[in-house]
Amino acid sequence: MEPLARFEEIKIPLIEPVHGLEAVSGVLGVPEWWPTGARVSVVLAHGASGSKDDPLLVALQQALTERKVLTLRFNFPFAEAEKSKPDPMPVLERTLRHAIATLGRDPTAAPAHLFIGGRGLGGRVAANLATSQVRSDGLFFLGFPLHPPGRPAELRVDRLFRIVSPMLFVQGTRDRSCEIPVLRKTLVRVGAPTTLHVIDEADQSFRVPRKTGRSAADVHREILTVLDAWIERVLGG
């Protein structure tokens, strides 16, 4: 049986070297028969303590690519250089912009639709970029860092009010960086269409207690189902 997708290790050039690096690593997921069909693409950015090999991002890429979506997950420079401290926001934004640009290198195979987002910090970088430099069909946040851990009064929401694309928030009830009641109040004030999906008992990394009887794979499947259905709705499917 022929595979439904292929996955290619790629290098994403950086205009300016960071940590002595001239490029960062990425994995491009190419669906069977691409670029036929709706030509939808999804770019997945990792969080502050992760990398492109975050198990959730790997699982999402595998499943979405098999569902005929062009996908890309990649390293920010600090992860590529195995540094623990994230790069300054301008560096992160440039890297995400370069990653997105790789999808359109071949105009004959460029996607017609773009969705960007990711885990924690990666989602925040996507939000920053979407307000000024990149046009996307939608943004998704897998654990949005709404405020510093345990300090809900110190909100980081200015960028959300400038976004016009639809947004999906997937949040765990035990995420100390995003209290659900505070997020709900914030989203009421956001002008763009928003969708919130809450995962009971999940923390910022979407881990759930053993008592729930749910495995990491169960949670990953739930997130995939929500993300896939949301993309379909945004595209009018």
Task: Describe each region flagged by the PLM.
Residues 10-113, 206-216:
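Serine-hydrolase catalytic machinery in alpha/beta-hydrolase-like enzymes
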Residues 113-118, 142:
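Short beta-strand immediately N-terminal to the catalytic nucleophile in serine-hydrolase-like folds
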Residues 118-122, 126:
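Gly/Ala-rich beta-loop-alpha elbow adjacent to hydrolase catalytic centers
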Residues 135-147:
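A conserved short beta-strand
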Residues 173-178, 204-205:
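Acidic catalytic loop of the alpha/beta-hydrolase fold
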Residues 190-208:
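Catalytic histidine neighborhood in serine/cysteine hydrolases
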Residues 210-237:
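Catalytic active-site module of serine/aspartate enzymes centered on a nucleophile-bearing elbow/loop
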